[in-house]
Amino acid sequence: MIKVIGVRFRRAGKVYYFNPLDMDITTGMHVIVETARGVEYGYVVLGVKDMDEEKVFQPLKPVIRIATP
């Protein structure tokens, strides 16, 4: 099992999974993450959850930090 969070970049967009590292991240928070398109700002729609490694595209990109208002 691997820990993941689900992040959206648009209101009704696809959910992307990221590695939360050791951060305490919950649903509703905003995060800065590393994506294939560079560093982006997203909204957490799925808090830290354990998932089977086969269901997640590896390697997961990390959360850089929790976004501040």
Please tell me what each predicted stretch does.
Residues 12-13, 36-39:
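A generic structural motif
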